[in-house]
Amino acid sequence: MITIPYLTAVSTYFSYGLLFAFGQLRDYSRLIFDWWRTNNLQGYAPICLAHEDFYIRRLYHRIQDCFGRPISSAPDAWIDVVERVSDDNNKTLKRTTKTSRCLNLGSYNYLGFGSFDEYCTPRVIESLKKFSASTCSSRVDAGTTSVHAELEDCVAKYVGQPAAVIFGMGYATNSAIIPVLIGKGGLIISDSLNHTSIVNGARGSGATIRVFQHNTPGHLEKVLKEQIAEGQPRTHRPWKKIIVVVEGIYSMEGEICHLPEIVSICKKYKAYVYLDEAHSIGAIGKTGRGVCELLGVDTSDVDIMMGTFTKSFGSCGGYIAGSKDLIQYLKHQCPAHLYATSISTPSATQIISAIKVILGEDGSNRGAQKLARIRENSNFFRAELQKMGFEVLGDNDSPVMPIMLYNPAKIPAFSRECLRENLAVVVVGFPATPLLLARARICISASHSREDLIKALQVISKAGDLTGIKYFPAAPKKQEVEKNGIKLD
């Protein structure tokens, strides 16, 4: 729950209203004075919806230089950001040959495997020489190598499940798997802030979807009670299947799932638990095994475990882990396994090598050091931001920490000021977040040194002063929320 002070809420609404008014005025002026330049195809339906087209032209274009900044280096603690210029008021951006060396607080490179690694990289290169860059085939044709089989065994062992299946894309893991698991006559109960891949997968399943308040087990139980009592729409027959979908760490909030309570409720009402560990696997827990290890939840109590290899493991793709019967069923039914090209062998080798480093099977203790460092870095950075007076979302141990901006004018102001000081940050606004809840999302890595973090804090503090986003008094004992505020989920 985020509480916005009234003054901040009013100024944010006013800013959006001003942008909307000027956008409408410009459209009206163009209709009158530049009518011959319009390119309306008679008889064709518009490709873009009117409100989406307006948002892109009149709001997004003003600040699009703050998004999708290209880089020309590995996503390490420091990256080379390619400079871009525009000669048409930001409508189009042209890349230049100049780069800026920036401290990287935007990548999901939690354990630092995204750049050269003394153990992983040589094995990836050797795999590339032996297997090439692609299998050029799906898993059921000629796209399964010994490395793919080894990776599935490695993942199953690592996450504590009997079996696993891997996919070439993390997003597609959710969006393609959920429709295979459940369909018409089934019920999906989803956290209100679940990732888009989960939302799209649920919509594509044909199942009935109900949403519970973000990370609130009490409301989840209320929804379960109501839906079980009511049954299917119109017929009121019992649900064929109920799946509760949650995330380990919520990527836009940095909050850790209340998994023990959710698992207990699902057991009580005989609902399956689907856990998305995209941002938690490898990043939290004593040995990097995610939210189950951190919170002491037995992995046998989680029916479907999903995760990606793009964050902590420095590769690509995703996985589903569960019972042997479940995995065998998915291998025979899931389109992402049957028809999509399998994950490249070098990418699979990178994941296997990273897991071996994490578990100490490379003959060193670098994995344990990385896990200790990501936790120490995350908690240090979060505490320092809060002392400065920023409104920071999320929980301790989480490497994801959003800083609330709220006002749309502060999105480009904060982003550009940080870039000017050679700090690369990610800013997020509508429609990725609710209209009033724009934020900067900080991602901490084990590859960051203490000096890196101190420099980042100095830059963020300066940018926060200039943009007015320090919503709390400096160095508070505890972040207190204003009594009079507007509460938003």
From Swiss-Prot:
It is found in: Endoplasmic reticulum membrane. Its main location: endoplasmic reticulum. The keyword Endoplasmic reticulum applies. InterPro entries: Aminotrans_II_pyridoxalP_BS (IPR001917), Aminotransferase_I/II_large (IPR004839), AON_synthase_class-II (IPR050087), PyrdxlP-dep_Trfase (IPR015424), PyrdxlP-dep_Trfase_major (IPR015421), PyrdxlP-dep_Trfase_small (IPR015422). It catalyses: L-serine + hexadecanoyl-CoA + H(+) = 3-oxosphinganine + CO2 + CoA. CDD domains: KBL_like. The chain crosses the membrane at residues 2-22. The modification N6-(pyridoxal phosphate)lysine is found at residue 311. Gene3D superfamilies: Aspartate Aminotransferase, domain 1 (3.90.1150.10), Type I PLP-dependent aspartate aminotransferase-like (Major domain) (3.40.640.10). Serine palmitoyltransferase (SPT). The heterodimer formed with LCB1 constitutes the catalytic core. Plays an important role during male gametogenesis and embryogenesis. This is Long chain base biosynthesis protein 2b. It comes from Arabidopsis thaliana.
